[in-house]
C-alpha cells in the first residue's frame, strides 16, 4: 500500500514539472509581445560643398608684350576679374614665373589699382577704388608669390561679382646703361579663398 502511494506522489510531482515549464514559457511569450512602441523620423539629410570660382577677360593673352623700351617708357592695361562662386571669398593678386636679366625688373615700376567701370584692356572708363594695392618695382612685386602675401582688398560676396584692375608700368627715367638689353617677365595670378 505504501509502495502505491509513493508512486502516485512521484507521478504527481513529475507531472507538475512540465506543466510549470509550459506555463512559464507562455508568460515569457506574452511578455515579449506586450510592449507599446512609437517612432518619429527626421527626413533624409543631405550635404553639398560650396564653390569659389574666378575667371578673367584676357582671352589668354598677356597684358603686356613690351619691347624696345627706353627710360621713361610707360603704359597701362586693364583686366576684369569675375567671381561666380557660391561662397563669399577674399581675392589676392600675386606673381608667378618671375625672371629678369640686367636688373631690368629693378628699374621697372609697377602700379596696380582696383576699381570699376572698365571691361576693356585699354582701361576706358576705369575708376580707381582708392589707393593702389601695389606701387613699387617689379623686383619687389616678385616677392608676392602666394595668397598668403598677395595684394588686394577685394572680398566678393556669393554670386556674380566683378572687379577691374589697372596695371601700369613705367621704366625709370634714370635707368642705368647696365640695364640695356635686359629682360623681365612675370605672370599675374588672382586667387580666391572662401571667407
Q: Which residues fall in each region the model found?
A:
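Generic structural motif
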Residues: 54-56, 110-112, 164-167
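C-terminal, structured domain-capping segment
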Residues: 70-97, 149-195
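Intrinsically disordered, low-complexity boundary segments flanking structured domains
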Residues: 38-44, 49-50, 94-100, 152-157
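Short beta-strand segments and strand-loop junctions that repeat across beta-rich extracellular domains
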Residues: 55, 113-116, 146-148
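A generic structural signal for short beta-strands and their flanking turns/coil linkers
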Residues: 50, 75-77, 106
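Surface-exposed interaction patch
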Residues: 25, 30-31, 35-37, 80-131
Amino acid at each position: 500500500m505504501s509502495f502505491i502511494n509513493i508512486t502516485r506522489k512521484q507521478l504527481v510531482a513529475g507531472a507538475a514539472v512540465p506543466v510549470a515549464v509550459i506555463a512559464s514559457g507562455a508568460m515569457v511569450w506574452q511578455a515579449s509581445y506586450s510592449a507599446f512602441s512609437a517612432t518619429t523620423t527626421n527626413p533624409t539629410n543631405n550635404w553639398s560643398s560650396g564653390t569659389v570660382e574666378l575667371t578673367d577677360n584676357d582671352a589668354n593673352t598677356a597684358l603686356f608684350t613690351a619691347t624696345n623700351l627706353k627710360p621713361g617708357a610707360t603704359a597701362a592695361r586693364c583686366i576684369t576679374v569675375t567671381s561666380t562662386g557660391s561662397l563669399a571669398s577674399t581675392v589676392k593678386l600675386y606673381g608667378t614665373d618671375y625672371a629678369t636679366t640686367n636688373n631690368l625688373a629693378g628699374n621697372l615700376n609697377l602700379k596696380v589699382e582696383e576699381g570699376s567701370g572698365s571691361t576693356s584692356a585699354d582701361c576706358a572708363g576705369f575708376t580707381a577704388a582708392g589707393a593702389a594695392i601695389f606701387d613699387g618695382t617689379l623686383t619687389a612685386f616678385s616677392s608676392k608669390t602666394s595668397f598668403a602675401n598677395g595684394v588686394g582688398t577685394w572680398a566678393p560676396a556669393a554670386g556674380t561679382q566683378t572687379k577691374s584692375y589697372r596695371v601700369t608700368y613705367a621704366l625709370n627715367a634714370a635707368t642705368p646703361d647696365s640695364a640695356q638689353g635686359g629682360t623681365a617677365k612675370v605672370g599675374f595670378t588672382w586667387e580666391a579663398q572662401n571667407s
